[in-house]
């Protein structure tokens, strides 16, 4: 979650907690909310953005991104989330981000036909996945890999604001999309570097890994090794 005051957990909690309790009362689970929010945001991004309907697309995606944030509040209201729920939420976030940049990439390439902007959008698409992967892989290795100037909330604000303003009814400002995409492309590359540096400077990051012993096929299948009559299949 962003450290900006208007994106703080306390600010969101004042709005999301009552909504979370209401959704739990009608029988929805946090995982169901995650799937619903992701499906709707992906549909909005992949249907509206390629058609050049950037303002409606940004509104739809933003609404369901906020809706998807309720899953965490729901999990806390019922006493905690599950490990599967955490993995599902992270996976759905990556799918949603990919759909947003993929839909915009289609419009930029085939609607606007702006080759330079295609480059910026591709950078945003790739780095949005890499930034998250660095953190996940680092934490799986017991290292730190968080931080950076651009995290997911800021990334969504920049790209959706740029898309929406560029197609805003009556007072559209078309340069808003290129400005947003290039800003995001540059800051995302910087964030990748920052996270890699954080991993590199984590305690134990440069220690040599101890290679694991190779496992023979017959061992993996539970068959006894030849010459080991005392070992039985398990």
UniProtKB/Swiss-Prot annotation:
Keyword line: Cell membrane, Magnesium, Membrane, Metal-binding, Transferase, Transmembrane, Transmembrane helix
Residues spanning the membrane: 28-48, 54-70, 91-110, 116-134, 155-173, 179-197
Organism name: Mycobacterium marinum (strain ATCC BAA-535 / M)
Name of protein: Phosphatidylinositol phosphate synthase
Domain of life: Bacteria
Residues where Mg(2+) 2 binds: 68, 89, 93
Biased composition (Basic and acidic residues): 215-228
UniProt xrefs under InterPro entries: CDP-OH_P_trans (IPR000462), CDP-OH_PTrfase_TM_dom (IPR043130), CDP_ALCOHOL_P_TRANSF_CS (IPR048254), PIP_synthase_PgsA1 (IPR044268)
Residues annotated to bind a CDP-1,2-diacyl-sn-glycerol: 31-34, 72, 76, 82
Tagged with keyword Repressor: no
Compartments where found: Cell membrane
Subunit structure: Homodimer.
Gene field: pgsA1
GO BP: any one term: phospholipid biosynthetic process
Function comment: Catalyzes the conjugation of the 1'-hydroxyl group of D-myo-inositol-3-phosphate (also named L-myo-inositol-1-phosphate) with a lipid tail of cytidine diphosphate diacylglycerol (CDP-DAG), forming phosphatidylinositol phosphate (PIP) and CMP. PIP is a precursor of phosphatidylinositol (PI) which is an essential lipid for mycobacteria required for formation of their cell wall.
Family the UniProt entry places it in: Belongs to the CDP-alcohol phosphatidyltransferase class-I family.
